[in-house]
């Protein structure tokens, strides 16, 4: 829309106005105005590399938006704003605070729609392309041999936890290295994405590594009894903490505090 457009029809140089005709351009160009789509601007932000572009047709299909109406205020405005279909006159009459709220709601709604879109056939294909390029990073575990990671949320409800990265090799979760990525809401990727992805692309399921690191001292493995003793001590400490949290006094007969 006009609020996100940038006029490139004229160029100002040393106080003089140079018309578009003086600038070498493609003869096929029939417009002097370039419009940045909201989705393009969103995806272009630093830290948004994990997201793929959701088709506008998917966003405007009411069936795909079921149960999302109450997640933001002025739902219809937000949907129109995301797909650049909101009338300029409405935007011009909004206060600065309302525009900021609209932008915030748009990012939230796009994220929640994104979580649904990436488990569709089209969405999985787009995320597959990003996975092949390791856009989500690689597993830091040495024996996983730079296995590509997949984004996942621990909750489907926004505002609970940030996105995590799942390794299909060691099947463990990791926190993104960049603070820009680690602050993204996990609900924008959902809890089902890795499972759906690996089911859709079974060839991407790696062989689980059998090699594990074994601690050694001067080349010798730790004695099994020493390992068992440490494990037993750890379990004892956990039990003590659990009992104390339930007001059990371990120094008295019967245990319970009076």
From Swiss-Prot:
Which named protein is this?
Casein kinase II subunit beta'
Q: InterPro entries of this UniProt entry?
A: Casein_kin_II_reg-sub_N, Casein_kinase_II_beta-like, Casein_kinase_II_reg-sub
Would the keyword Chloroplast be found if you checked this record's keyword annotation?
Answer: no
Lineage at the top is:
Eukaryota, Fungi, Dikarya, Ascomycota, Saccharomycotina
Q: Where is the signal peptide?
A: none
Task performed by this protein = Regulatory subunit of casein kinase II/CK2. As part of the kinase complex regulates the basal catalytic activity of the alpha subunit a constitutively active serine/threonine-protein kinase that phosphorylates a large number of substrates containing acidic residues C-terminal to the phosphorylated serine or threonine.
Q: Which PROSITE patterns match?
A: CK2_BETA (PS01101)
Q: Which Pfam family, any one of them, does this sequence belong to?
A: CK_II_beta
Q: What else does UniProt say about it? A: Present with 7160 molecules/cell in log phase SD medium.
| Gene from which the chain derives | CKB2
* Record keywords, A-Z: Phosphoprotein
């Amino acid at each position: 829309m006009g609020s996100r457009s940038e006029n490139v029809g004229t160029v100002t140089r040393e106080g003089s106005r140079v018309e578009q005709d003086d600038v070498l351009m493609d003869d096929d160009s029939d417009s002097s105005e370039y419009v940045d789509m909201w989705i393009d601007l969103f995806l272009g932000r630093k830290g948004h590399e994990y997201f793929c572009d959701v088709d506008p047709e998917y966003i405007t299909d009411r069936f795909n938006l079921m149960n999302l109406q109450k997640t933001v205020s002025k739902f219809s405005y937000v949907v129109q704003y995301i797909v650049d279909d909101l009338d300029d006159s409405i935007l011009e009459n909004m206060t600065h605070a309302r525009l900021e709220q609209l932008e915030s709601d748009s990012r939230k709604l796009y994220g929640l729609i994104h979580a649904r879109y990436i488990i569709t056939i089209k969405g999985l294909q787009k995320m597959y392309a990003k996975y092949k390029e390791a856009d989500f990073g690689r597993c830091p575990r040495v024996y996983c041999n730079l296995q590509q990671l997949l984004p996942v949320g621990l909750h489907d409800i926004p505002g609970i936890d940030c996105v995590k990265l799942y390794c299909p090799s060691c099947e463990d979760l990791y926190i993104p290295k960049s603070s820009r990525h680690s602050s993204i809401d996990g609900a924008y990727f959902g809890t089902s994405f890795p499972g759906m992805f690996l089911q859709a692309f079974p060839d991407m399921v790696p062989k689980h590594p059998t090699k594990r690191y074994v601690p050694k001292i001067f080349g010798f493995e730790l004695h099994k009894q020493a390992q068992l003793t440490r494990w037993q001590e750890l379990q004892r400490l956990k039990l003590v903490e659990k009992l104390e949290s339930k007001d059990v006094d371990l120094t008295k007969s019967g245990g319970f505090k009076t």
